Amino acid sequence: DPCQVKNFEQAIQENTKLIFIETLGNPNSNIIDIAAVAQIAHAHKIPLIIDNTFGTPYLIRPIEHGADIVIHSATKFIGGHGTSLGGVIIDSGNFDWKASGKFPQLTEPDPCYHGIRFCDVAGNASYIIRIRAILLRDTGAAISPFNAFLLLQGLETLSLRVERHVANALQVVDYLSKHPKVEAVHHPSLPQHPDNKLYKRYFPKGGGSIFTIDIKGGIKEAQRFIDSLEIFSLLANV
């Protein structure tokens, strides 16, 4: 259970290289105490990597709470229109990869890049520099110029869109939480959500626009509900 911070401490072994969490969990928008998990990670000299796709840079900035690396699927809220594929890796530059002693690919000579030691060349930025120098070259995971343009264009309206997403979600959540045919609604803004206290601490601008519901009557009623939707679409992606 990732919501119990002590479980991270107990799960760490000698070969553990990192801790990975989400700012808002999929699908029930669970929230983990980022600062507490960051403290555990750093005590064991491993980085905390956070997926902030659902949280978005507008609602929360994980690096300010102790995250070392933040990733996004930019296809979702950053792009905002479902038109382009892309991802983002943000390195805080705060983690000391050399002192960790767990990352020989950063501290030992790299034979495929002239024998350099990335930690000696780039210091705390060695992780992100190696991604650009080695992984980007070897895998070809370079975004197309037009997709990059669309994502940059999406960033211009991110705050306005997410603000409206959150406002709309809260209205729907409020309505559904009172509906007689709904068993439960899962969104951190609700007092009954198990992570409501963390929501108030980490998400002053709102806890995102993703929520789930439990329909009374089981799977058949849930299917009937989905088939009856007129405004919302049934999709495999966010």
Predicted regions and their residues:
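Conserved PLP-enzyme active-site core in the AAT-like
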Residues: 1-179
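Conserved C-terminal alpha-helix-loop-beta "cap" of PLP-dependent enzymes
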Residues: 181-238
